[in-house]
């Protein structure tokens, strides 16, 4: 019926203008119902600029006579409608485009999203307790964790809470896997065995997706019940996932009154005529700035309701990366769409030699990697930014301190603030011994792969000097674990587990004093301290560590690998 009215209106300009006004009134009534910021979910108010939720109320434009029938057609079906301008008479298509209304957002979000200006104090952190208090007992939870940084952001306790039905949902899969089959099939088998053998959790409720490439979105939707809550750390991809699900299954944002009753009507045929503008109004606010979401926001997709919650922060008093890393570098690491997926296929490496003088490799000063003397190594970095070698760490810090402006010839290599570039601002992380390749993960930044080439010979331990406040872990290459483990499991018809069960595959680093010389001895001492309450996890307890690392083992020994879940 409504579709026929649109088509008939094109034959009569007067009717067309009438339909145009109806179309515009829908936007006005929709905006009248919106009492929350479309980006962060906070309640809006336009009375006190110094109070949370302040926004500048837009003034309604005045619509005059349109100049042509083509203008009206374009209005109704345009895929590129623009923002509102205040108090502007509309008499042409160009002016009409400029008056189309956008969802209301608070001034904080507007400045952050459109001007890249924000005060960290306005982006408060939430504990996991703060977030869980917003969820009714017995609810279905999807614990959202970015796959490329796993197991960072993973909270084991969420899968063990008895009064929630929790599934593990791994996002940003395109930053680790080359194809969607790894996410759809292989990862499901691997993580089922990983949870069982590494953590002692029996669960087959794991889904891996890529919201950016729409990989395996159907499995994520299938994992959702009538009411599902997305729970995860800040900036792990919850909003991007919601938007992908809404696009695929035609969802929309829901609003509630003060009594908690839904006041949003289902979209009509008219609403969906301009699908691009429709989704622009409905989408969850996606930002590279952590802690953008401040309140629960609901969405209806098919017959299911999905709730986006503020991201929690494990270390509520942790460092702010904005105080360490330059804004443009930080934006590159946080924006998912800026990740270069070609690196996953080409895997072009850089060779780095270790020497007695302390030759090192860095990406922006975000880390300095110092390989053992006498080794030749390959590194593939998936962290945005150009890498560079220096004679030693002190030389690298000296250069970056001098990079005060873009005029410096090496400015493009510097990603940290010059005032950070003092030795005392960096922490010495030592990697436990390994065979073959490993991946080093920097929390909320990215990961890179390193491999020592040539015949195996232990020549020392790899060191990473990282700014204080950035967490680091080491793992066996995750994509290889998933693919090879899944293959062995399939070939053995399920007799061989898809995940190793007799060795740890993830480990924390060992933070030692800058002057410590007996690294292996100190590592053993720290290993015993870490495992004092987890004695069953201890391995090679009575073996000579030098004897263990001196020979090549058929299976990785992963000496002193340990991660506290």
From Swiss-Prot:
Function noted in UniProt: May be involved in the mitochondrial lipid metabolism.
UniProt cross-references to InterPro entries, sorted A to Z: G_CP_dom, Mito_lipid_metab_GTPase, P-loop_NTPase
Protein name (record): Genetic interactor of prohibitins 3, mitochondrial
SUPFAM superfamilies according to UniProt: P-loop containing nucleoside triphosphate hydrolases
Family matches, as PROSITE patterns: G_CP
GO cellular component, one term: mitochondrion
Family of the protein in this entry: Belongs to the TRAFAC class YlqF/YawG GTPase family. GEP3 subfamily.
Localization: Mitochondrion
Organism of origin: Zygosaccharomyces rouxii (strain ATCC 2623 / CBS 732 / NBRC 1130 / NCYC 568 / NRRL Y-229)
Domain of life: Eukaryota
Keywords on record: Mitochondrion, Transit peptide
